[in-house]
Amino acid sequence: MDARVSWKQNLSFTGTAESGYELPLSAKADVGGDEDGFRPMELMAISLVGCTAMDVISILRKKRQDVTAFDVNVNVERADEHPKVFTSAVLEYEVVGRQVSETALVRAIELSAVRCCPAQAMLGKIMPIAHEYVIYEDEGDGRRREVVRGRYEYC
């Protein structure tokens, strides 16, 4: 894989990769940035949730789960001192659907964590990554009811 960033001004860049899409990168104003793009560490967090989200929804669809909405959130803790690396992460999978199986969701999370997601594989070598989930029953008209909440643990 090849990627590139091109400097625009101050601490603003445009990133590109083999896919051909452009992505704005920037920094906080207090360090000289224009705040007109993603910060690099934000992109690492988005890469983690994006990678596992694609795995999990693909697996749930293959298992014929009736998912009507799906979000993955991540909370990443960082070191206090520079270079302020990631020290831990908690992924939370929010699934809305009709009779979504907890067993199917846990298996999808497990496959993503241990087999499919290169972002988790890399970041998991340097920090703990916890996995939490919640399943909501889609009751129509934008209404949903929490069915189950849990945590997936792996070594």
Model-derived segments and spans:
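Extended beta-strand/beta-hairpin segments
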Residues: 1-46, 57-155
